[in-house]
Amino acid sequence: MKVRASVRKMCQHCFIIKRRNVIRVVCRVTPKHKQRQG
């Protein structure tokens, strides 16, 4: 998982989740696209 200051969708399969005020990007097709803001 990458930790970044700004997260964005890297492909059309990525989707954004907000959990406990932490924004995450999850991708079922390419797990390499997982990101967390922080």
Curated annotation (Swiss-Prot):
Question: Which GO cellular component does the record give, naming just one?
Answer: ribonucleoprotein complex
Keyword line: Ribonucleoprotein, Ribosomal protein
User: Sorted alphabetically, which Pfam families does this protein's record hold?
Assistant: Ribosomal_L36 (PF00444)
- What are the GO BP annotations of this UniProt entry? translation
Superkingdom to which the source organism belongs? Bacteria
**Gene Ontology MF, one:** structural constituent of ribosome
Q: PANTHER family this protein is in? A: 50S RIBOSOMAL PROTEIN L36, CHLOROPLASTIC, LARGE RIBOSOMAL SUBUNIT PROTEIN BL36C
The record's family statement is: Belongs to the bacterial ribosomal protein bL36 family.
Which protein is depicted? Large ribosomal subunit protein bL36
Q: Which organism is it from?
A: Blochmanniella floridana
The lineage, from the top, is: Bacteria, Pseudomonadati, Pseudomonadota, Gammaproteobacteria, Enterobacterales
